[in-house]
């Protein structure tokens, strides 16, 4: 029985690392609030779903609805009202952009932007764009 415990722990660690690798990992520790953590998790889910979609179909999804059932993207996630944030998605077969803009800017609610590069950009007091600083 004791010889099984290290093997089980190793298996759990391997599976956990595999899941993190597939999902892009947890939201960055730089989130300033739960709202930001949820929003960054949503962005990572969309970025991952777009990578999977492109690998499968040879182009990016042109709408959030097209991503449903790709990766872990659900039908409910296609709704652009994300609580404290509003989602703006612009998709073409060759590229896409995703913005999450807080309904009310605050020190713990910044705006985020990402595109097909997979890099997340941030702004403190205005909507983030492709020219905004990278999230660190």
Which residues does each PLM region occupy?
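Boundary of Sec targeting at the N-terminus
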Residues: 21-22
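Bacterial N-terminal signal peptides
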Residues: 8-18
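Extracellular/periplasmic head regions of type IV pilus-like filament subunits
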Residues: 25-34, 41, 45-109, 114-117, ...
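Short, Lys/Arg- and Gly-enriched loop/turn segments at beta-strand edges
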Residues: 131-133
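Bacterial N-terminal signal peptides that target proteins for export
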Residues: 1-9
